[in-house]
């Protein structure tokens, strides 16, 4: 059995927000395994925070660019990391992120974008190398996303923009369908703001990682069994919790932040009826700078979005 040291207890306490004695008990029960102990605490209803292990701090910018293509659109989003927040306000860095985002319009994936040329002919990887030498900070293209629709729109949204199309959170939402592109774009922007606020994990239940669902099911089952209720009742309790979980993390099933009385799926269907043509959300991406890292209070995104749209 692994020794439960004071350092292990301290680490688990910092990651879970649970008291020292409960952390020690969790570690004893799970042979000193931090991740297993966090799951154990969650199952007991003690953990105040989700797993926070293996998360890397990052600064820099998320950049977005959108290009009209006939009746459709192409859009790209990139996350370029740097060492300090100060660099996000540097014009050279901002210009570089915009160039990298534009390279993402015709190239998909970090590797392809890194090997591609910017609009002025410089290879993206060389651009970053030169910028590192000039500014003296390490920089890296961490993530990218690209959407294209032949008919419809790809809407974008930057939360708390540092400069036009640059900020700490960038969202793209691709909607396919015929009709007034301006209205489709308006719908897409509302959904993009919703995505920034709620951070859904998937577009539909089928897209959600089944391992994540089973993990939640196991935790919910352990919690329900502690109630002492009959197995049939426990099963219903668990299924109810799973439905609620999906409503919280699946975009189309979420309550729309600007009108909680309807889901995003219902919002899209209603908009399609108004346009006289069905609309389909083909995909979305939410790039948050240094995603998953706690850096202190950041405010309530849902409340901010509602306030910005006059829904508060």
UniProtKB/Swiss-Prot annotation:
It comes from Caulobacter sp. (strain K31). This is Elongation factor Ts. It is found in: Cytoplasm. Belongs to the EF-Ts family. Residues 84-87 are annotated as: Involved in Mg(2+) ion dislocation from EF-Tu. It comes from the Bacteria. Disulfide bonds: none annotated. The keyword Cytoplasm applies. Pfam families: EF_TS (PF00889). Keywords: Cytoplasm, Elongation factor, Protein biosynthesis. One of its GO terms (cellular component) is cytoplasm. Associates with the EF-Tu.GDP complex and induces the exchange of GDP to GTP. It remains bound to the aminoacyl-tRNA.EF-Tu.GTP complex up to the GTP hydrolysis stage on the ribosome. One of its GO terms (molecular function) is translation elongation factor activity.
């Amino acid at each position: 059995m692994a020794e439960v040291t004071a350092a292990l207890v301290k680490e688990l306490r910092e990651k879970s927000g649970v008291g020292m004695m409960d952390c020690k008990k969790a570690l004893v029960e799970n042979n000193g395994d931090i991740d297993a102990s966090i799951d154990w605490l969650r199952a007991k209803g003690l953990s105040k925070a989700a797993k926070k292990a293996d998360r890397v701090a990052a600064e820099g910018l998320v950049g977005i660019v959108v290009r009209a293509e006939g009746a459709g659109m192409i859009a790209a989003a990139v996350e370029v990391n740097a060492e300090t927040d100060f660099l996000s306000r540097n014009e050279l860095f901002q210009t570089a992120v915009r160039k990298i985002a534009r390279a993402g319009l015709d190239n998909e994936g970090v590797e392809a974008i890194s090997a591609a040329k910017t609009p002025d002919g410089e290879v993206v990887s060389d651009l970053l190398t030169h910028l590192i030498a000039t500014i003296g900070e390490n920089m890296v293209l961490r993530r990218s996303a690209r959407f294209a629709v032949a008919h419809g729109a790809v809407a974008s949204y930057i939360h708390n923009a540092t400069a036009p199309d640059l900020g700490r959170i960038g969202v793209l939402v691709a909607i396919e369908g015929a009709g007034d592109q301006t209205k489709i774009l308006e719908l897409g922007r509302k959904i993009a703001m919703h995505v920034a606020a709620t951070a859904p994990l998937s577009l539909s239940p089928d897209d959600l990682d089944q391992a994540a669902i089973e993990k939640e099911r196991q935790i919910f089952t352990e919690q329900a069994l502690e109630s002492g209720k009959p197995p049939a009742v426990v099963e219903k309790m668990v299924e109810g919790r799973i439905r609620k979980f999906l409503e919280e993390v699946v975009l189309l099933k979420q309550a729309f932040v600007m009108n909680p009385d309807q889901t995003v799926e219902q919002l899209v269907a209603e908009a399609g009826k108004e346009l006289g043509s069905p609309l389909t959300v083909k995909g979305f991406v939410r790039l948050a700078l240094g995603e998953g890292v706690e850096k202190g209070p950041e405010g309530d995104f849902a409340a901010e979005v509602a306030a910005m749209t006059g829904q508060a």
